[in-house]
From Swiss-Prot:
Cytoplasmic side: 1-13, 83-86, 146-149, 202-219, 273-282, 326-346, 415-458
Location(s), subcellular: Cell membrane; Basolateral cell membrane
Function according to Swiss-Prot or TrEMBL: Ammonium transporter involved in the maintenance of acid-base homeostasis. Transports ammonium and its related derivative methylammonium across the basolateral plasma membrane of epithelial cells likely contributing to renal transepithelial ammonia transport and ammonia metabolism. May transport either NH4(+) or NH3 ammonia species predominantly mediating an electrogenic NH4(+) transport. May act as a CO2 channel providing for renal acid secretion.
Motif Basolateral sorting signal, residue numbers: 429-432
The keyword Hydrolase is annotated on this UniProt entry: no
UniProt keywords, alphabetically: Ammonia transport, Cell membrane, Glycoprotein, Membrane, Transmembrane, Transmembrane helix, Transport
Modification after translation (UniProt): N-glycosylated.
Catalytic activity: NH4(+)(in) = NH4(+)(out); methylamine(out) = methylamine(in); CO2(out) = CO2(in)
Descriptive protein name: Ammonium transporter Rh type B
Keyword Transmembrane assigned: yes
Bilayer-crossing regions: 14-34, 62-82, 87-107, 125-145, 150-170, 179-201, 220-240, 252-272, 283-303, 305-325, 347-367, 394-414
UniProt family annotation: Belongs to the ammonium transporter (TC 2.A.49) family. Rh subfamily.
Length: 458
């Protein structure tokens, strides 16, 4: 793409050098620390005289496949709604997730599975790494179109560390239950990205306003991402829950919640839409809020009715957020939320955390029976009451918001370093800044500027 020679040279070197450095450093750390766990290592597995059918691979890998498809296909295509940013939406999703899953294997490994001087990995490590990558991609949605790939890799480098620490504090130190990640994934990823976007605020972004919308075919491709996410979300929430009734219940609650959020979204979209017409932005995003809102409580005894009610509420709140709150977020709070992650992940994530507080507080031995140990082991052991568990669930939400806000602020300062390449204000949401785009897709209105204006450089 045309531009100053120094800027083009910086772009040519910055991404390759950063990719090579990050991959090289990760490879060295893998060589030193990462080993197969006892369910993956040939010698250790067969030493135990186990049947191959008992290996956790056969129980967990189907869920991993679904989660993997959500991360790379669902999230990637959900963000292709921008008319001139499809290559970047899918391509940078691919890049970020590929790095994040490696880096998070190390970070989470040091925190959760570090024994005898090594990190031990298996299929559950893959699922956890994909969960972390999902949080990074949620944050990416808030700054979509306004950042370069080198900036995004540095964002992931920081966010993965903070994600791992926050998850460790909630799940291991506080004993919070969050099977589907309403707090650890959605709330953390959303508010990390929103604070990051606030720090990177661009007052002259109006110069790229004409590229910020969608066209017919870009919305259609984005709907592919929605359908992938919608279909596989029960697997996402249940991927790491206790096998048996717990996993079964988690998938069922998510299934009903998604269905109800879809109907709520269609209803509200037509109600608030111009001339009673549906808005594809609402359908693409708010219909998924049902999966987010039951992330914390889906393994609990939420009841099918509770799942339907939660999903419907999430769908309506998310739709209203896209219609009314997103413009306020930009005009009053100076948060330029490209994908509306506050509406799809932020608000439903907080609602999901609060729903978890309520359902945890109602937990009794009569309701759960012997299953109480797999959902609330500390209550089953008599180490805490249901009320104490509920209070710690609420405190976990506060801790998550704190980590996300501080981390997003630090990330914003890091990404504002002047030597990092980012698109100028006049060329945001434009693939040709970072990609070779086929010539037939150019027209006079979309052809890149020959000379970049100094006053629009980020």
């Amino acid at each position: 793409m045309a531009g100053s020679p120094s800027r083009a040279a910086g772009r040519r070197l910055q991404l390759p050098l950063l990719c090579l450095f990050l991959q090289g450093a990760t490879a060295v750390l893998f060589a030193v620390f990462v080993r197969y766990n006892h369910k993956t290592d040939a010698a250790l597995w067969h030493r135990g005289n186990h049947s191959n059918a008992d290996n956790e691979f056969y129980f967990r890998y189907p869920s991993f496949q679904d989660v993997h498809a959500m991360v790379f296909v669902g999230f990637g295509f959900l963000m292709v709604f921008l008319q001139r940013y499809g290559f970047s939406s899918v391509g940078f999703t691919f890049l970020l997730a590929a790095f994040a899953l490696q880096w998070s294997t190390l970070v989470q490994g040091f925190l959760h599975s570090f024994h005898s001087g090594h990190i031990h990995v298996g299929v559950e490590s893959m699922i956890n790494a994909d969960f972390c990558a999902g949080a990074v991609l949620i944050s990416f949605g808030a700054v979509l179109g306004k950042t370069g790939p080198a900036q995004l890799l540095l964002m992931a480098l920081l966010e993965v560390v903070l994600f791992g620490i926050n998850e460790f504090v909630l799940l291991h130190l506080l004993g919070v239950r969050d099977a589907g990640g309403s707090m650890t994934i959605h709330t953390f990823g959303a508010y990390f990205g929103l604070v990051l976007s606030r720090v990177l605020y661009r007052p002259q972004l109006e110069k790229s306003k004409h590229r910020q919308g969608s066209v017919y075919h870009s919305d259609l491709f984005a709907m592919i991402g929605t359908i992938f996410l919608w279909i596989f979300w029960p697997s996402f929430n249940s991927a790491l829950t206790a096998l048996g009734a717990g996993q079964h219940r988690t998938a069922l609650n998510t299934y009903y919640s998604l269905a109800a959020s879809t109907l709520g979204t269609f209803a509200l979209s037509a109600l608030v839409g111009e001339d009673g017409r549906l808005d594809m932005v609402h359908i693409q995003n708010a219909a998924l809020a049902g999966g987010v809102v039951v992330g914390t409580s889906s393994e609990m005894m939420l009841t099918p009715f509770g799942a339907l009610a939660a999903g419907f509420l999430a769908g309506t709140v998310s739709t209203l957020g896209y219609k009314f709150f997103t413009p306020i977020l930009e005009s009053k709070f100076k948060v330029q939320d490209t994908c509306g992650v506050h509406n799809l992940h932020g608000m439903p994530g907080v609602l999901g955390a609060l729903l978890g507080v309520l359902v945890a507080g109602l937990a009794t031995h009569e309701a759960y029976g012997d299953g109480l140990e797999s959902v609330f082991p500390l209550i089953a052991e008599g180490q805490r009451s249901a009320t104490s568990q509920a209070m710690l669930q609420l405190f976990g939400l506060f801790v998550t918001l704190m980590f996300a806000s501080v981390g997003g602020g630090l990330g914003g300062l890091l990404l504002k370093l002047p030597f990092l390449d980012s698109p100028p204000d006049s060329q945001c949401y434009e693939d040709q800044v970072h990609w070779q785009v086929p010539g037939e897709h150019e027209d006079e209105a979309q052809r890149p500027l020959r000379v970049e204006e100094a006053d629009t450089q980020a």
